[in-house]
């Protein structure tokens, strides 16, 4: 592109104007308004044509070269923007602001909007059920400042995080569509691998200027009131975000009213692997089906669904908040009160995002119509909320409030079914503004005026052949036949002479003409001005309206959780101070919904006497389901929800870790085993005695001996850490752990064989499993029968020839032993060796020392 911009004087005047604007936005697609089209030029055109599947053509020449070009109709803009934003592209909208009729040279143009994935607010460009977040990060490997903004709601937060590992986990949680990092950071950092990462000038993150702009935004002298005045790095990141938002929106941001200081210590932390494994809101295939959210989300509003997603992705450790939510759900269940609220909440709609668009001054007429309907529904909702008698619900009712004056204003202003955009008018009701009514009447009723005028003039003049008409050249006129022209009244002024007729105009008709000819454009301008004024009236009340939206979203979530508790048979968990995790008849909330047979519920008990369960049993026996359901029950408890269990008693946890499943990281150059060990290392470094740890088949990605050794050592470390641990394994040798680790207990998932086929019973029972049923599972999977038969032969030989011994692997503190399990050969058993056979036959009592030494030398050579 540089070759086209090296000398602007060589370009045509229009392309000079284009390049002056384009050079300010080199990395973004520019849509350049020309008449009824947005034109796209040069490299932008080539890229856009490919992404949008539109025709690439050429437009004349400039600077001696043809100009690659493609274009789209201006009225189709939104559809194309949707495609580009979903592809992660940013688009600059350049509009004509000058009047082509009066412009000398190219019509004046300027950039009016910049659409980026993280700063879009248009309804068509957003997923209504998910937050659309943009983040900025500043710092080094030891400490990072992170700021997160949702421009579609006004939520703006900061936090500081120690180390890359925790930063990447937090980025995985919030999943921003754009991430801003300083341009002076080294290349190929972990954060830069994320899609949507953009580098910004280092001075955009400068702390002092950031502090100044943030204080100006919130109309405060300092940030002490937000509790984040000492977060130097996070303030720098927040300043960068605020500047970026203003740059893209080209307007003030009144809906950004505060800065929330978040702390990781206040939450239950889940790393990226754990979030993926538990499938909270995205399944392992990248979809939304069969996720926890798909089961627990029946919210009536989109803003309620988004809030529930935030809760699921950020479980709390604040017992006061959790118990307030539990009490609220109990109240809503009492007498099925939630059933009265939910239909009313459905009438509210997504006012959170509507208010953001009002703040950005790009709200559309239908946004205001929906806000009108929402405010109109508030009084009836308040009636339904009078029965709610918990302090938290009562506070939500007070915050929700009512807005009778604002509702009346919108009812008076906006027609029942307004058009999508204000561009062509037709939005405001008759009676809202007398001047607008007059202008619209002139424009719409000109024909009737002319009919009435003609009748009056005929009566006044007595000239029966008088006609009133209009043409584009001479405007409005009164026409008389030539023979009657001499009888025209004195106030008739001659306008045009025709063959056989004369045309006149009167002062009254002239006054009407002046009004009528400009009435339509003046009416449209007046309506747009009134619409902007209406937005300003709404902006003046934005703060309480946003509080109302937040209260209604939470009420929606709590009502939803009450409905789910009733229909999914969920019960209220009890938080206790002593360390424990006791679940009676726990169920997996997602698996239970997709099964066509009844789900087999199971108990779990972890406390000061038992901190680890070693779980054995066949593949498909339910080990992973049992582990995951425990994590989901604990997570639901920590958002204040009821849980899928007959009863649940637990203490607060600080983290949930999962090491489940196997997959490689081709992009990162890591094998399946490397991924497994990285996740294991993260757990061993960061788990505490208040963490819940799920470990599934650790060590299976390498050789038997290496894998077993690593699994054994990892289990010992977790036992010493006293973390709440569920350790599923096929290494039966690990079932001896309780003999050396008093906090470890064996359990297994049972199964049985019937008519040579395996039947999974899915019950969790005490003690280790007696069989692995590996061949039976292989048969179920469709492995050919001859392969199964041959495998049975190999298994029989291995079981009969494996070296019998009692001692397996000694722990660092104590040698352990266990009796051989039926049909399960020891993983450390080796096949017979001739040297071992001879050693077994030696008569040690009959050997002299010299003979014994000679025998050892001979045997050593043969090993």
Curated annotation (Swiss-Prot):
GO cellular component, one term: cytosol
One GO biological process term: mismatch repair
Domain of life per record: Bacteria
GO MF annotation list: ATP binding; ATP-dependent DNA damage sensor activity; damaged DNA binding; mismatched DNA binding
Residues holding ATP: 617-624
The keyword tRNA-binding belongs to this UniProt entry's keyword annotation: no
CDD domains per UniProt: ABC_MutS1
Cited Pfam families: MutS_I (PF01624), MutS_II (PF05188), MutS_III (PF05192), MutS_IV (PF05190), MutS_V (PF00488)
Sorted UniProt keywords: ATP-binding, DNA damage, DNA repair, DNA-binding, Nucleotide-binding
Record function comment: This protein is involved in the repair of mismatches in DNA. It is possible that it carries out the mismatch recognition step. This protein has a weak ATPase activity.
HAMAP family documented for this protein: MutS
UniProt family annotation: Belongs to the DNA mismatch repair MutS family.
NCBIfam families: mutS1, PRK05399.1
Name of this protein: DNA mismatch repair protein MutS
Native organism: Pseudomonas fluorescens (strain SBW25)
